[in-house]
Amino acid sequence: ASVVNGFDSIGSSQAGYEWKTYPERLQQAGVSWKIYQNMPDNFTDNPLAGFKQYRRANEQSGQPVSHSAACPPYDEAIDAKEPLYKAIANTMPDGGFLGTFKQDIAEGKLPQVSWIIAPETYSEHPSPSSPIQGAWYTQELLNALTDNPEVWSQTVLLINFDENDGYFDHVPSPSAPSRDQNGKLHGKTTLTAEQISYEYFD
């Protein structure tokens, strides 16, 4: 298997994917949504950056963002003119440390659907991050959200980590043990300890 990251960062609206995305469907249905990320440090884990319609919204926002330069904080006033802009804007200008997310919870402004895109340090990608750092980030998200049960019960939370590599497909998935018809226990990995030893993070 291979990965082609041709549209993993913001570029010109002359190129990119074109099919209708979930945020567009939510927008059309009148469901509030927002993508919380730090730009430029989202570790290119926001696939919407590769779609022409979001690239166009970025170009027409008056505050275009990119993966290669400091970006202005998201301005909610832009939403009236370019509602797709909040999918690629710098909505967590604090470096991705959840300040805006926590503020939106405290002020009752958390949308019905929230995506969180972790910055590089918490992406769980081998080298800049680890499962421990990703778990801490997820814990902080959930703590912030569950501090307010009224908000918690009225939102969908989606967390984006490092797109399609990193630890999740390099460590054998856990398997629930089960017994066969002879009572023998099954469910462990078929790889030897030596074969998987380099996959563990110390």
Language model segments and positions:
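N-terminal pro-sequences and low-complexity stem/linker regions of secreted or lumenal proteins
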Residues: 1-202
